[in-house]
Amino acid sequence: MFAIVGHFGTNTVAATLDYLKEKGIPMVYAATGIEDLYQEGATGNDKVIYPVQPIYNSEGRVLLARAVAPTDNGVGLGGTKIGVVATTDDAGSGLVYGVKKQAETLDVEIVYQDVDAAATDYSAAVNVLKNNGCDVVIACMNQAPLATLMASMRDADYNVDVITSYVSASAVTLGAFVENGSVTADRRVYSTAWLDTSTEEGMADYMTFYGAMSAWELENGGTGNDYALNSYAMAGYIAGDIFIQALKALDESGLELNWANFNDIMEATEFKLPMGGTISFANGDRLAVTSLALNTISLEYGESGYYELELVSPIMSLEDVLATIK
């Protein structure tokens, strides 16, 4: 086996990372954001792991940058004192790690509150942030705890904007918050996104994906539309595309196809993600993608007849977001 391309399942990935490193088998793309994938300056066989989709640890850095960045052109939320509510599970701990990591380079006051992911009321944490005058809240958590947080903010009449992970970027989930009054014009929820088809380039990439998937389905007894909007199909496609980009770069270099040369090429190449931004694995950094867009949920039904995600700011690299902060 030369490489694992598209490694799926949080538990599966977590259980096999050490084995892949031990054997030196490259892994390109993991369909999970667990913090075990996060590495800074990896060396030796640790370098063979190449995560692509956002890792909580890295995304936390983006959340803080977007929370503090100026509101010009929708780049950020313009926060001056940031409240962080983090669940004590893997998602919360990973995201808050990233927040604290990025805070090392930003002159901003932050108030942290830990909560139990299974709790049904976060009023104590919410009141701490409200009483401290936090004007933006970062929600380091998954969808279910986010619902609890938003309801607690509603009940406390705490009207500030909230920013959270792409894992909660669901029009159904966020639309329900509008319905129950947790989200209002004075208390918006913003979420990141690592894929964006709202741009001409993004839609062109999607149509290329659609064409490839449709052709494969028709050749294999499908309808040609079975996986057009399937997130797992997109994940597998992106994994394969990154791998092919690496093989093409290796071929153009004239180097022999082996693990050592493949790993060198992976570190030397800046990859373009279909429907997304760019990603680099240089210098042993395994941060996954940190070029993310910013969305919010509509406050009224859109043309679809449902609440819709609205693009606030297109995909920007973390470096570009940070450059807007004075």
Protein language model regions, located:
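Short, charged, surface-exposed loops that flank catalytic or proteolytic processing sites
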Residues: 224-227, 248-264
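Short acidic/histidine-rich motifs immediately flanking catalytic phosphotransfer sites
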Residues: 1-3, 131-136
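Solvent-exposed, acidic/polar segments of extracytosolic/periplasmic ligand-binding ectodomains
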Residues: 270-326
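Extracellular/periplasmic periplasmic-binding protein-like sensory domains
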Residues: 46, 153-237
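Structural motif
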Residues: 60-62, 115-129
